[in-house]
């Protein structure tokens, strides 16, 4: 009996019954955005960081960010050291 229900259900779905039809034809559906709408080429920041609002003290996260030269040294250090000795090397590097 279950097999007959499965056969009927498959035949209705494959036959394109009224229940399987779309509520709106595909030609009536419009997209509200283009493919590149909202894409920006500029740098995005998730924080509100304005020079007017700055009080002179920076966040701890921003204060301790390394500059480009220090990041290049860190990348070179990571490239030359093995994974087991990298932890102590990073501690020594960041403590300077």
Swiss-Prot record:
One of its GO terms (cellular component) is host cell nucleus. Residues 1-19 form the signal peptide. It comes from Phytophthora infestans (strain T30-4). Residues 27-59 are annotated as: Disordered. This is RxLR effector protein PITG_11507. Effector that enhances P.infestans colonization of Nicotiana benthamiana leaves. The lineage of its organism: Eukaryota, Sar, Stramenopiles, Oomycota, Peronosporales. A motif (RxLR-dEER) lies at residues 44-59. The keyword Acetylation does not apply. Induction: Expression is induced during host plant infection. Residues 46-55 have a biased composition (Basic and acidic residues).
